[in-house]
Amino acid sequence: MAYLGSRLGDINIRRFPDGEIHVKIVDNVRGRDVFIVQPICTQPNEMLMELLIMIDAARRGSAARITAVLPYYGYARQDRKDQPRVPITAKLVANLLVAAGANRVLTMDLHAQQIQGFFDIPVDHLHAAPVMVKYLREMELKKPLVVSPDTGGAKAAYAYSQMLGTGLAIVAKQRMGDAEVDAFSVVGDVEGCDVIMVDDMTTTCGTLCAAAKLLKEKGASSIRAAVTHIPLTEKGVERLQADTSLTELVVTDTVPLRADLPTNKLPVKLTVLSVAELLGEAIRRIHQDQSVSSLFRY
């Protein structure tokens, strides 16, 4: 809000004794352009329900337009039916946001870009790349090389390599279950390189740590991971504590680090970059009906 020179709207959120959520927007929103900021993380079910109720309250308060700002779009990994009798929860979340009364969605680095097609309202999809690339350029690495920790992230990794003017390598992996990952080969030469692994998110750090170990075995000089979202779990912290391959983990503040996890005692350097100005500029442009996509022309 400091970037926009505006104040945060006043809203009261409380719980009834039975656990139900009650929301009251204190400020008058009639005829206003309302932006509701709420990442669906940490306690995704609670956060999602809060968001839906806030949107409904703004709609019933006669807001002119309601934009749901989701720095982190929870449930994004459930984006397709890959087994019998499973839901496509990412689509369900989209339906709920629209049904509640959202006129527009602003989010960042979706796990699957096709989620934008789940909506029948405009979706502005931001990327953390400008923030990450600025930081990485300032490091002046001797022999940088961008690496995708899996084949699915190759497109995003290629974009980073173009922005940084580096080569590209890919780690091919075989997933065993939902959290266990067996990285088995590297496509490209990483020997002597300052590796930058690019990923949209990590929770248990299985892919990240397995890929880092393999890259170190292949002769990488240093290994950094640039990850937009980090809804870290206990398992993720355990893996990072045991890891001896990663030099630095660079993340953004789209997801707050859990206070109950000892993230300040990790052997790997943890750097948190702010995307507040990027989100603020996108909000300003949406409010003024200006282009958002021009933020990402390099």
Describe the predicted segments one by one.
Residues 1-298:
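PRPP-associated nucleotide enzymes
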